[in-house]
Amino acid sequence: MNPPLDTHQPHQGAPRIGYVLKVYPRFSETFIVTEILAREAQGEDLSIYALRPTTDARFHPEIARVAARVNWVGRPNRAIDLWSQLTEGLTRQEDRERFAAIMPVLAELPGDVVAQGVELARQARRDSITHLHAHFASLAGRVAWIASALTGIPYTVTTHAKDIFHVSVDPVWLRRICSDAQRVIAISRYNEDYLGTVLAGTGATV
């Protein structure tokens, strides 16, 4: 099921959707390619934001049909790079104020995740993105949450399995990401029922 288009558009012109993915392309996630192609066939304007480089040696041939530009969201490996990325991404006073407001929450995350959230916000604004869509409510969901909090660009998230069922899932962050999302997409009725339980009281729309 495709996430809905956002009706609030902070930029002029047609909606532009930013897909936030941990890795792209990934052979085991051809369903994402299928979804992107379906949306492009409907005339939607998409951009892809990848948080990690692919390590796959083979790719689905359908990837060649994807028109969306792929953007690499830099992941700093050194402290100096992390601080540089934060500084370059927070040049606007409004962004710095929003960043300060969510700092207590960001302190729960690794620094490189925070830096990627800031960088995604910068790129999304640069590309006039009107809506973000994350696949998986884990890394991609967290980075999209940060970018949305800094820019006001709304987001949706498609949840899958490991990102909601695995023992490593942080329930606080799962609830935070889903409650602030414009909409949460579940891939099955079972998952939808499960999310209805774990997200109870958050106001999340599944």
Where are these regions (language model features)?
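Short, well-ordered alpha-helical microsegments
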Residues: S28, A140-V143, E192
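N-terminal subdomain of nucleotide-sugar transferases
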Residues: M1-P76, D127, I153, S179-R183
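A short, active-site helix/loop in glycosyltransferases that binds the activated sugar's phosphate group
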Residues: S179-V206
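Short N-terminal targeting/anchoring amphipathic segment
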Residues: N71-W72, E108-L109, E119-L139
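Conserved N-terminal ligand/cofactor-binding loop architecture of enzyme catalytic domains
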Residues: A50-G117
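A conserved, positively charged/aromatic
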Residues: Y155-Q182
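Short, flexible loop segments at the rims of nucleotide/cofactor-binding pockets, characterized by
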Residues: V23-P25, E108-G111, T159-F165
